[in-house]
């Protein structure tokens, strides 16, 4: 799988912080509302350097804990301006489980309820009997970014664990994409059908930046002109680093099948929402992740996708946030469950990597 910097402009900044003692920060979710750059950091009492789990001195046996912090960043330097510890002040009962806290929060905004989050949770007690399962929870925040309301998304579909739903950002009301290649849309109450199966853009939001044809053409030309050089450089790097890097064959055929939600979906055209999903395999008994950029339309149908790429050269990688400001695309991702990073690129360059999805009609 190729590195991101072989395919697109790719500048990476380490934004790792430790808002809580003896806890690592990971899986950051960046969000931009046109004025403020916010980012939720997931902070945990364990980490996975090199795919091997280590635990902090504060970790309790048989238990892992997640706390969250909201960071306001200066987008020029990516230095923190303000840090808020997000306290859990919702009134839902907790269960005695091994995983505590709201995990991998994705930030999004709607006209109806403002800034919200969607997270995975195992620690909320279910009212009915049965096994505790990971489920998605919609979070409401106050002005200090405390979690003041948590609404589990439950129903007939939740007999199996549910994680990594992709929220549509800056839309009229909450919409979530699950099963990217199938285009399954949900709201906060459950699966959508009929006329409700659509994402309506915010009536208050900014107009999306759409690169003109000249910008798109230049990006495509740069990608095509440098392909051979990139291949040569990639082979040289792969040969020289063979003892330190896993060699994974790039997925063939329908490379986009089985993608799982990573970042929010951000509007990138009149009927186009851009996101990044991930896939994973095992290499030498260790997890190996890669990412794919993709576009869906307002009904959640997959229209195009990039070929797989690695956001980080090595380690577990997990993208949870994305924001677009003009032609600037900012991606936030975690590495080895112990680092938080920002990757910056160009919208025109990203769109130039996308390939149309042609589906057969039965």
Language-model segments: residues:
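Beta-propeller domains
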Residues: 1-362
